[in-house]
Amino acid sequence: MLAVFDLDDTLVDRSSAIRRWAQLLVGREGMSADAIGAIVGIDRDGAAPRDEFLAVVHSLPGMRMTVTELRNWYAGSYLSCYGVEDESIRALTTLRAARWKIGVVTNGSQERTTEKLTHAGLAPLIDALCVAAEVGVPKPDRRIFDEVARRCGVELSGWMIGDAPVEDIGGGAQAGLRTAWLRRGRRWDGEVPPPDIEADSVLEAVATILNADQRINTW
């Protein structure tokens, strides 16, 4: 069986990482504490292109670095804001013990994705990684799901676990996967058909998936 995971705010806590980075920057530059929330908002959950994000951050009151200095400092400091993801390690270890294949599909960059997985302690637990920039198509395109299944050496059948309604849940469902949505304090908004299950954590999602699989196998 195949379990496909999103990366940011699914396997790794990106929201906390960008807030940690904002705190580091504000402390370094002596900026107002209010700038932390502003920086997190400018990031838009990672949707803001990095050059745009850093240009707007540079315009905030109290910034002393030049744009180039800020870019270089971001490149050297951001990934250090990610830590070991104990809960995700437990979830993936449980799946592997049950002989599931584990794939990761992300629209992020290849270099940063690999480094995030390493920082989180997840790299040894993953069978295949598909990054949109490397594969040539982003989620929710079915082809990136086909590719992660191919790299795992299994048919495209199983589950997609993620936090993004369109890219993860909509894309996974269109690819024929069952879907698990990580709520992150939100309610389902009906933008695409609802997920098969909702959960508050990766560990909860995996436990529910394994219970569902066990029930199917005992029928």
PLM features per residue range, with description:
Residues 1, 89, 93-96, 101-105, ...:
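Asp-based, Mg2+/Mn2+-dependent phosphohydrolase catalytic module
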